[in-house]
């Protein structure tokens, strides 16, 4: 009611092309007195109380509306995508698919330009209902990504059973990618498995040039993280994308010294 919630967005790039191909929407709470509340604090409370359902509906429409505006203004590619995180409470809401449909209609965005991001934990809680909802979303063209992949307990069985289209490699693996052989082997295995299943892969939390070079060597073509861009406000996205699009192929034009 006080309009203290807002969205920021982090660009996702194609490492080989150097293009911004999509964005992830992230929620922020800035109070009237100027202080900020961490999502790690308010999201669990919103989930527990159920208020995450209306908040999530607002965020979904807001994110898609931002994307439609950027496309119309020529800020990003016409096929750029928006990734929106969805909580267990939202996914188990019987009206969720209708909410997604309405947001797509009101924003005039095609379904295949929306990524719904869920964690493996979402599929542990009431798996049959989660499976039904994700299948219905997939049927209308919305794509599903597993966020923080590799940190859960039943990843492989979920990949076989659920309609998953993308794996987002958790930042804990990326942190040690350039310096730890075991981390590199794990990331290589995840990428190879995803490729064999026809799944898209995005590396999260890329913060150093060395990590980006390592991802390029492992043929992971999509990435996001502070090296590329911090989450930015909708108003500053035009200058952010313009700056990123001028860089070109990231590993080649940011050589290691």
What does each model-identified segment do?
Residues 186:
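Conserved N-terminal phosphate-binding loop of PLP-dependent enzymes in the Aspartate aminotransferase
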């Amino acid at each position: 009611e006080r309009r203290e919630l807002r969205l920021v967005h982090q660009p996702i790039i194609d490492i080989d092309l150097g293009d911004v191909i999509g964005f992830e929407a992230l929620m922020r709470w800035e109070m009237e007195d100027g202080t900020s509340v961490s999502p790690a604090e308010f999201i669990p409370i919103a989930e527990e109380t159920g208020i995450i359902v209306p908040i999530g509906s607002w965020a979904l429409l807001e994110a898609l509306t931002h994307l439609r505006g950027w496309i119309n203004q020529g800020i990003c590619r016409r096929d750029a995508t928006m990734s929106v995180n969805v909580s267990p409470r939202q996914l188990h809401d019987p009206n969720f698919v209708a909410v997604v449909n309405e947001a797509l209609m009101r924003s005039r965005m095609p379904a295949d330009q929306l990524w719904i991001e869920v964690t493996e934990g979402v599929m542990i809680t009431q798996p049959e209902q989660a499976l039904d909802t994700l299948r219905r979303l997939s049927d209308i063209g919305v794509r599903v990504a597993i966020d923080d992949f590799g940190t859960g307990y039943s990843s492989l069985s979920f990949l076989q059973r659920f309609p998953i289209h993308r794996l987002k490699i958790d930042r804990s693996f990326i942190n040690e990618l350039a310096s730890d052989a075991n981390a590199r082997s794990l990331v290589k295995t995840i990428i190879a498995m995803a490729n064999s299943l026809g799944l898209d892969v995005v590396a999260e939390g890329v913060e150093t040039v060395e990590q980006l070079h390592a991802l390029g060597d492992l043929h992971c073509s999509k990435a996001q993280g502070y090296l590329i861009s911090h989450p930015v406000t909708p108003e500053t996205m035009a200058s952010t994308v313009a700056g990123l699009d001028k860089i070109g192929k990231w590993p080649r034009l940011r050589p290691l010294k």
